[in-house]
Swiss-Prot record:
Belongs to the universal ribosomal protein uS2 family. HAMAP family: Ribosomal_uS2_B. This is Small ribosomal subunit protein uS2. One of its GO terms (biological process) is translation. Keywords: Ribonucleoprotein, Ribosomal protein. GO terms for cellular component: cytosolic small ribosomal subunit. GO terms for molecular function: structural constituent of ribosome. The lineage of its organism: Bacteria, Bacillati, Mycoplasmatota, Mollicutes, Acholeplasmatales. Pfam families: Ribosomal_S2. It comes from the Bacteria. Residues 235-269 are annotated as: Disordered. PANTHER family: 30S RIBOSOMAL PROTEIN S2 PROKARYOTIC AND ORGANELLAR, SMALL RIBOSOMAL SUBUNIT PROTEIN US2M. The keyword Ribosomal protein applies.
Length: 269
């Protein structure tokens, strides 16, 4: 049984690419057609690539590996955090700190400091300090929690990294590739698919579509850990469908309803 249906992809608006003038020629195999100066992504290809990514991530987790979810755009931060927590994986939902992977020993020292600050507060040690000093310590703890909270339990490097926007997170991509960590990523028509090992061609500005893909990758991790993947009904309940509201991240100038009969026949052409 397919992990995602064409109907789900259609309703989530993942098939809208960028303006044709902004396209990356390497994305040609994943483009179905163009309309009104906008590339339309081939949903059959998207479905196939999601299936490949899902199975590979499932295999990695089943083999005892761990994944890191990365997405720092404000609109999807909560989804990255919640789905990573649901699937018991690591995440970064704010700015990527250079060297998080390639200089992991230094990052571990910062993580140790974060744990120490939490421990000191829990044990009541801060109550003995001047108020001004406590304010400084809280500020330091909160900053560390903001950037390292999602990886504070990460004692070793992950075996996979799922990236919402590989072009924006180019430093993380470079670090992962240097270390041989498998890179999974959502790639729009203006992006370079060579940046990732497992490409998911999709509209990276369709909030519901992006959340759908993050949810699917989290399901792969849940299943890899021996759990039961959530059903589509659960995703729909958490992310109610809002027709004609798929492009609110960067507000692309689409003027037609995403669900047109001509696109529903993609798999038949």
């Amino acid at each position: 049984m397919a992990v995602v249906t064409t109907k789900q992809l259609l309703e989530s608006g993942v098939y809208f690419g960028h303006a044709t003038r902004k396209w990356n020629p390497k994305m040609k195999p994943y483009i179905f057609t163009s309309r009104n100066g906008i590339h339309i992504i081939n949903l059959k290809k998207t479905s196939e690539e999601i299936e490949k990514a899902y199975q590979e991530l499932l295999n990695i987790i089943t083999s005892g590996g761990k994944a890191l979810f990365l997405g720092t755009k404000k609109q999807i931060q909560s989804s990255i955090r919640e789905e990573a927590q649901r699937s018991q994986q690591y995440y970064v939902d704010h700015r990527w700190l250079g060297g998080t992977l390639t200089n992991f020993k230094t990052i571990l020292k910062r993580i140790e400091l974060l744990h120490l600050l939490h421990k000191q507060e829990e044990e009541g040690l801060w109550k003995k300090l001047p108020k001004k000093e406590v304010v400084k310590l809280k500020r330091k703890r909160d900053k560390l929690e903001k950037f390292l909270g999602g990886i504070k339990d990460m004692k070793n490097l992950p075996q996979a990294i799922f990236i919402f926007d590989p072009e924006k997170e180019s430093i993380a991509v470079a670090e992962a590739r240097k270390l041989g960590i498998k890179v999974f990523g959502i790639v729009d028509t203006n992006c370079d698919p060579d940046l990732v090992d497992y490409i998911i061609p999709a509209n990276d500005d369709a909030i519901r579509g992006v959340k759908l893909i993050i949810w699917l990758m989290a399901n792969a991790c849940v299943q890899g850990n021996g759990g039961v993947a959530e059903k589509a009904e659960t995703f729909d309940a958490k992310n109610p469908l809002k027709p004609q509201n798929y492009n609110t991240l960067n507000k692309r100038p689409y003027q037609d309803s995403p669900r047109k009969p001509s696109y529903q026949n993609q798999n038949q052409r």
